[in-house]
Design a protein with these regions (language model features):
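Short Gly/aromatic-enriched secondary-structure transition segments
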Residues: 44-51, 232-233
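C-terminal nucleotide
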Residues: 1-32, 57, 61-93, 190-338, ...
């Protein structure tokens, strides 16, 4: 659906559910794809994401009381989810609207006043479970709605931090800051080079000329909560505690590759050693990839993407058969520069850099290989790099 069609669908459903549509407002917040720098954001490293043109949309209107009503066109079977002041229960709330409620809860925790409730209808065009940050998109959407409707004095980087806080503490997911920051701070045709230790960031133009970035979706649903994601964070923290005995560091992201290799044998557990190796080398690959993109060296950028995936597969162990099948099928093609999993892993999507004129052949050949091996089809999206949240 085009944006105008989405607004119309939201308005019609809003009228059907809540009656009066006078004074409703419309908002959007993007999803994101990470070009390189995976599982580095909670390790104090660098990430290199960009916001996407797909994301979450809402029609919303203030209420006169303190009640909230949420409805999603994507989860129509759930009906209207209502919440009064006493219906915000961290770590117990498992409905889709928990990502919105968590932000309201987090804002009040941070001393931002939410003076009244809202009626809201949502539509998202990020495939659920794709690893393109539908949850962060919802959090940034809710944050920007509250910022605009209630005139809250809060910056977009602060909205990203509120989204991360709510996902950690309300939804029970120990995510880093990357997803929310990429959604909140997106800039059209630019990637965000973010130092997650300091939140210092810069924009890097994505100049691909005769090349393009294709996102390939395994269509394997992943749910990070309760999966190995939180285990990886714990393992990384264990590695950091060991290495802090030998270096005055606050995060693994402070180490060079040489630092790590000089110290790696101090980590006796081979699993913990592998986790640390990924965190350190992936951070330094990300710094090198940003430089390669700025210099127009797409071959080097592609090589770094490949090394990133190999590390996520072998050292961090967050890939899966479906992701590896997509990556292997892509890399077998001579016009592909690099391919890697993107997002938390265990399913979701890959991101591939290739020659633009070959993109239809790429989709056909990868789709054939994937379905032959996995037994069901994958999907493709051309990455369209977008601005951050906005009122429509």
């Amino acid at each position: 659906m085009r944006e105008e069609e989405i607004k119309k669908a939201l308005e019609e459903k809003f009228y059907e559910l809540y009656g009066n549509t006078e004074g409703i407002r419309y908002f959007f917040a993007p999803g994101r794809v990470n070009l390189i720098g995976e599982h580095t954001d909670y390790n104090g490293g660098h990430v290199f994401p960009c916001a996407l043109s797909m994301g979450s949309y809402a029609a919303v209107k203030k209420r006169e009381d303190k009640n909230f009503r949420f409805y999603s066109l994507n989860v129509e079977g759930a009906g209207v989810i209502s919440a009064g002041e006493d219906d915000f229960t961290p770590l117990e709330d498992k409905q889709w609207a928990a990502y919105l409620k968590g932000v309201i809860w987090a804002m009040e925790k941070k001393g931002l006043e939410i003076p009244c409730g809202l009626d809201l209808v949502l539509y998202g065009n990020i495939p659920n479970g794709s690893g393109l940050s539908s949850s962060a998109s919802l959090e940034v959407l809710m944050g920007s709605i509250c910022k605009e409707l209630f005139g809250l004095s809060v910056s977009f980087p602060e909205l990203a931090l509120i989204g991360q806080y709510s996902e950690n503490n309300y939804n029970g997911m120990n995510c880093g800051i990357m997803d929310q920051f990429a959604s909140a701070m997106g800039k059209k045709d630019h990637a965000i080079f973010l130092d997650t230790a300091t939140l210092q960031f810069s924009y890097a133009p994505i100049v691909l000329k005769d090349h393009c970035i294709i996102i390939s979706n395994t269509n394997k649903k992943h749910k990070l909560i309760g999966s190995a994601y939180n285990d990886r964070r714990r393992e990384s923290e264990e590695a950091l505690e060991i290495l802090q005995k030998f270096r005055p560091i606050k995060s693994l992201g402070e180490l060079s590759d040489e630092d790590f290799f000089a110290l790696e044998n101090e980590i006796s557990d081979p699993i913990i050693r592998k986790r640390a190796k990924h965190a350190v080398l992936e951070n330094n690959r990300t710094i090198a990839a940003k430089k390669a993109l700025e210099e127009g060296d797409l071959h080097r950028f592609g090589e770094l993407m490949n090394l990133s995936h190999n590390s996520l597969r072998d050292d961090y162990e967050v890939s899966c058969e479906e992701l590896d099948t997509l990556v292997d099928a892509a890399r077998a093609l001579p016009y592909v520069y690099g391919s890697r999993m993107t997002g938390g892993g265990f399913g979701g999507c890959t991101v591939t850099l290739l020659e633009k004129e070959k993109k239809e052949e790429f989709k056909r050949r990868v789709a054939e290989s994937y379905e032959r091996k996995i037994g069901y089809p994958c999907s493709f999206y051309e990455a369209e790099v977008s601005d951050g949240p906005r009122e429509l």
